[in-house]
Amino acid sequence: SREHARVGADNEVVVHAASRRLTALTLDNLDDLSRPCRSCVSWELDPVAAQRAQDSGDVALEKEAWLSAVLLEWGSCGFVAYTGSQPIGHVLYAPPSMVPRAASFPTSPVSPDAILLVTAFVQPAQHGAGVGRSLVQAAAKDLLQRGTRAIEAFGDAQWERPACLLPAEYLSMLGFQ
């Protein structure tokens, strides 16, 4: 199927493919993130603070606080994909200075001129339909328009199931090296 995209009002990217649309992530649609990611602050907090949030049950509040801070200090940091009104995937990205967990990877640090593709998720029923590619392309377009020189991501070479790290093979298919 052919797709084409246009940027609409309020930073909404409309992708014409079976009524799929991508909308900028905001506090208003934060609850549309998939459950594993909505209740995870693995990237957003350092490991100790993430465990503390998990133990206290404040994960959703911490996720909202992180998103609010990024939106206020830096601007748009993700997109949510929908088919009709149903959320089917998302992508998150931010400057590495706003992603505490990024510093804990052996291949850190992220280049100073790069933005970190934090994570992406596509509902299993949508795998192979181009949703993930559309999300990453929307992120890349947004970042290019903002003058970003590079996008970096951490990948999992042993990926077996959805997790906070994207499969390295998938990132490679999208052009990451």
What are these regions (language model features)?
Residues 109, 118-128, 157:
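A short, internal acetyl-CoA/4′-phosphopantetheine-binding micro-motif in the GNAT/acyltransferase core
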Residues 1, 6-52:
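Conserved N-terminal entry element of GNAT/NAT acetyltransferase domains
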Residues 36-74:
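Aromatic- and Gly/Pro-rich amphipathic surface segment
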Residues 33-35, 79, 90-92, 120, ...:
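Ligand-binding pocket scaffold of soluble enzyme catalytic domains
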Residues 122, 128-144:
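Conserved acetyl-CoA-binding loop-helix of GNAT-fold acetyltransferases
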Residues 136, 143-162:
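Conserved GNAT acetyl-CoA-binding A-motif
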Residues 167-177:
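Conserved acetyl-CoA-binding loop of GNAT-fold acetyltransferases
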Residues 57, 69-76, 82, 87-119, ...:
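Conserved acyl-donor/pantetheine-binding loop and adjacent beta-alpha core of acyl/acetyltransferases
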